[in-house]
C-alpha cells in the first residue's frame, strides 16, 4: 500500500484516499503495513501520522529517501527494505542510510523483476542475486555477511510474525 507520484495516474488525491483507507484496514486487523512510497515522502508521512499507522509496525519497501527521513521511520520502529539499489554507483543517499541504520531494523528485498543489483543490472531480478546486496551491506557496515543474513532473517520473521 502507499503512494507513487512517479506517474500521473491514478491522481494523487485518489491515491491518498485509498492509502488512508488501507491504513485503516491494517489498524482494524492489527496487521503490519508494507509501504510503497515513491516521490511522495511528505504525503506518506503526513497520512501515516494522521492515521496513527505506527502501532502495528511495518516496512518501507525499497527505501529511497534521505537519512533524515530514514530516521523518522526508524524512530517509529519501522523496518527499511534494502535491495539492489544499494549496489548502484549513484546510490549515495541509500548507502548513507545503510551505514547509519541499525541492522535490527533492516530487511532485504529483491523488488523482482526490477532493480537488479550490480553486477547483473539490466537483467531480470531474482532472489538469488541478494548475495550481492548482502555483500554491499557488509562492506558499508564493516561486518560479517553471515551476521547480516542472520539478523535480517530474524527481522523478517518478526515483521511477518512467522513462528509466533
Where are these regions (language model features)?
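Catalytic pocket-lining loop regions of alpha/beta-barrel enzymes
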Residues: 11-107
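Residue-level recognition of specific faces of alpha-helices
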Residues: 59-62, 97, 114, 129, ...
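Short, glycine/acidic-enriched loop or turn micro-motifs at the edges of active sites
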Residues: 3, 39, 64, 112-114
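Metal-dependent polysaccharide deacetylase catalytic core of the NodB/CE4 family, i.e.
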Residues: 2, 6-8
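Short acidic/histidine-rich active-site segments
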Residues: 104-126
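Non-membrane alpha-helical structural segments and their capping/turn regions in soluble enzymes
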Residues: 9-20, 38, 124-131, 146, ...
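Mid-to-C-terminal alpha-helical segments outside catalytic/metal-binding sites
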Residues: 25, 127-164
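Metal-coordinating catalytic core of metallo-dependent amide/deamination hydrolases
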Residues: 1-2, 81
Amino acid at each position: 500500500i502507499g503512494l507513487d507520484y512517479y506517474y500521473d495516474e491514478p491522481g494523487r488525491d485518489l491515491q491518498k484516499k485509498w492509502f488512508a483507507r488501507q491504513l485503516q484496514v491494517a489498524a482494524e486487523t492489527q496487521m503490519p503495513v508494507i509501504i510503497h512510497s515513491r516521490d511522495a515522502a511528505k504525503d506518506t508521512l503526513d497520512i501515516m501520522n494522521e492515521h496513527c499507522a505506527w502501532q502495528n509496525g511495518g516496512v518501507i519497501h525499497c527505501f529511497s529517501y534521505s537519512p533524515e527521513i530514514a530516521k523518522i521511520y526508524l524512530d517509529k520502529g519501522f523496518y527499511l527494505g534494502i535491495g539492489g539499489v544499494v549496489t548502484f554507483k549513484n546510490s549515495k543517499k541509500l548507502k548513507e542510510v545503510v551505514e547509519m541504520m541499525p541492522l535490527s531494523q533492516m530487511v532485504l528485498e529483491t523488488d523482482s523483476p526490477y532493480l537488479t543489483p550490480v553486477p547483473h543490472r539490466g537483467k531480470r531480478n531474482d532472489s538469488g542475486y541478494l548475495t550481492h546486496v548482502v555483500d554491499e551491506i557488509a562492506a558499508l557496515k564493516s561486518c560479517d555477511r553471515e551476521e547480516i543474513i542472520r539478523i535480517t532473517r530474524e527481522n523478517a520473521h518478526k515483521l511477518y510474525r512467522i513462528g509466533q
